[in-house]
């Protein structure tokens, strides 16, 4: 698996040995970032990114490659955090990232450096975690007004977002769906 575009284009990302972590495919990442660049006034440039269920870090690393200013990568799994550390170290992104161990559905208050302008959520498919994680982001004031939130979930899954997140785009790519929300002015 490789970084699709930007200053790290073509660099190889380490992938998980187990099937417990499902990285976002190169094709799907390219589609996500094309949407963000062309339909949402290049929401990536200079963004402060939070990546929930970060896994390999593919989404946050792609954002950093394309000009994001900082990424907080959140995952509760020890295998995922080891993979995140390996990818960040191999790509020299230590100064632009922080890895945080947390349950994405029970985040609490936003850490120093928040609120964030761009969020990625790629929970395990079919486990109903997207809705609680979105609610946790909103309840903890993790998102600035106008922040974009990109959710990858199974194509047929329902994504229950809190009222503060307004749906602005949704697309299906094979077995996956991408839903994009914008944070309203009040959290």
Feature locations, PLM:
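Class I S-adenosyl-L-methionine-dependent methyltransferase catalytic core
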Residues: 1-187
């Amino acid at each position: 698996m490789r970084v699709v575009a930007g200053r790290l284009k073509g660099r190889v990302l380490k992938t998980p040995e187990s099937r417990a972590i499902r990285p976002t495919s190169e094709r799907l990442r390219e589609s996500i970032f094309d949407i963000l660049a062309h339909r949402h006034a290049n929401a990536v440039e200079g963004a402060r990114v939070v990546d929930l269920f970060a896994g390999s870090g593919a989404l946050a690393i792609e954002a950093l490659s394309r000009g994001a200013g900082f990424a907080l990568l959140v995952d509760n799994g020890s295998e995922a955090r080891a993979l995140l550390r390996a990818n960040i170290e191999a790509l020299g992104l230590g100064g632009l990232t922080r890895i945080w161990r947390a349950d994405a559905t029970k985040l609490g208050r936003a850490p120093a450096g928040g609120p964030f302008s761009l969020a990625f959520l790629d929970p395990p498919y079919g486990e109903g975690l997207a809705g609680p994680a979105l609610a946790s982001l909103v309840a903890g004031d993790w998102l600035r007004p106008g922040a974009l939130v990109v959710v990858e979930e199974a194509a047929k899954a329902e994504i229950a977002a809190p009222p503060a997140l307004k749906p602005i785009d949704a697309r299906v790519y094979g077995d996956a769906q991408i839903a994009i929300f914008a944070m309203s002015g009040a959290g």
